[in-house]
């Protein structure tokens, strides 16, 4: 019997959608040696993820959906569960980007109900922290990038 857990958050990054998406993908593709910008769907890696337990859990991380300047989706799976993380990017009229991150986790093997609720509680807290961090990092890194571009233009002038 499987159990589902869904989480979703939306925030604003203060830059154009193309800039936000390109910067996000530049960081995301570092994990995938076979990343193909034209069609990265199907790229996958094996990765050990630490969860606080005695030993790390071996997972497969695969890019399962991709639309340039619109969507990036990865599926992380192991023998116990599967988590689909979807990042959607929507350009706004004011030149900012609305970034929505949603996660759907399915536990494939029976897990004691109390354990499941505790895991979900901590997962939601971690998800919120991670989301705020992603928005903050994107805003800060893009700000620094564009400040450096401006400085470089002034030096040439």
Which residue stretches match the model-derived regions?
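Hydrophobic ligand-binding cavity/cleft-lining segments
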Residues: 1-41
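Residue-level preference for beta-strand/loop junctions
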Residues: 3-5, 55, 81, 95
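A short, structured loop/turn motif at beta-sheet edges
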Residues: 14-18, 64-69, 88-100
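Short amphipathic alpha-helical segments
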Residues: 16, 20, 123-126, 130, ...
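Glycine-rich portal/gate segments that line the openings of hydrophobic small-molecule binding cavities
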Residues: 25, 30-84, 133-157
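Beta-strand/loop substructures that line and gate deep hydrophobic ligand-binding cavities in soluble
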Residues: 79-129, 149-151
């Amino acid at each position: 019997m499987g159990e589902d857990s869904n989480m979703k958050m939306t925030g604003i990054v203060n830059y154009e959608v193309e800039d936000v998406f390109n910067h996000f993908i530049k960081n995301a593709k570092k994990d995938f040696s076979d990343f193909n910008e034209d069609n990265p769907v199907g790229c996958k890696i094996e990765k050990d993820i630490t969860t606080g337990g005695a030993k790390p859990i071996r997972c497969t991380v695969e890019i399962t959906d991709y639309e340039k300047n619109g969507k990036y989706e990865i599926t992380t799976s192991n023998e116990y569960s599967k988590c689909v993380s979807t990042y959607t990017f929507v350009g706004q009229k004011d030149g900012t980007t609305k970034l929505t991150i949603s996660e759907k986790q399915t536990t494939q093997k029976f897990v004691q109900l109390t354990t499941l609720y505790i895991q979900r509680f901590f997962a939601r807290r971690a998800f919120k922290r991670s989301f705020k961090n992603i928005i903050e990092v994107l805003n800060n890194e893009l700000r620094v990038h564009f400040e450096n571009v401006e400085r470089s233009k002034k030096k040439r002038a």
